[in-house]
Curated annotation (Swiss-Prot):
GO terms for biological process: fatty acid biosynthetic process; lipid A biosynthetic process. Belongs to the thioester dehydratase family. FabZ subfamily. It catalyses: a (3R)-hydroxyacyl-[ACP] = a (2E)-enoyl-[ACP] + H2O. Its EC number is 4.2.1.59. Coiled coil: none annotated. It comes from Methylococcus capsulatus (strain ATCC 33009 / NCIMB 11132 / Bath). InterPro entries: FabA_FabZ (IPR013114), FabZ (IPR010084), HotDog_dom_sf (IPR029069). The active site is at H47. The keyword Protein biosynthesis does not apply. This is 3-hydroxyacyl-[acyl-carrier-protein] dehydratase FabZ. Involved in unsaturated fatty acids biosynthesis. Catalyzes the dehydration of short chain beta-hydroxyacyl-ACPs and long chain saturated and unsaturated beta-hydroxyacyl-ACPs. One of its GO terms (molecular function) is (3R)-hydroxyacyl-[acyl-carrier-protein] dehydratase activity. It holds the Pfam family FabA. One of its GO terms (cellular component) is cytoplasm.
Length: 146
């Protein structure tokens, strides 16, 4: 799935669209995506100018956007392409390695369960096979505009 297709599913836009491409998707199971991190990212201006590091909360946001894509692909008939998935919970958040300009962040979301409109996913971020971060992410589905 390229960026144009991603934009059909996610409401985010520059500078907050943090998924560049979907590499693999098994609806109901898992989704693997990438974020190419460049020195031109707006957050590097202040975090930190001499030692640029991607903020951990933005790594989590990239993972949350990945979960929204997996949920949309898993249950397109629930709310359709116009659905918005809101981040409603985080558990077991861990960070191990900083993400710096030039890194390609691999984002993996694995479906755990859902009840009504709340979805849960196990998520992991890596750079070149090296563990960066992980979290259990919960999101809620809502129709666009609600």
């Amino acid at each position: 799935m390229d960026i144009q297709a991603i934009k059909e599913f996610l409401p985010h836009r520059y500078p907050f669209l943090l998924v560049d491409r979907v590499l693999e998707c098994e609806p109901g199971k898992r989704l693997l995506a990438i974020k190419n991190v460049t020195y031109n990212e707006p957050f590097f201006q202040g975090h930190f100018p001499r030692v640029p590091i991607m903020p951990g909360v933005l790594i989590i946001e990239a993972l949350a956007q990945t979960t929204g894509l997996l949920a949309s692909e898993t249950a397109p008939d629930v709310l359709g392409k116009g659905a918005t998935y809101y981040l409603v919970g985080l558990d077991k958040v861990r960070f191990k390695r900083p993400v710096v300009p030039g890194d390609q962040l691999r984002l993996e979301a694995t479906y755990l369960r859902h009840k009504r409109n709340i979805w849960a996913f196990a998520c992991r971020a890596d750079v070149e096979g090296e563990f960066v971060a992980s979290a259990e992410i919960m999101c809620a589905a809502a129709e666009q505009g609600s």
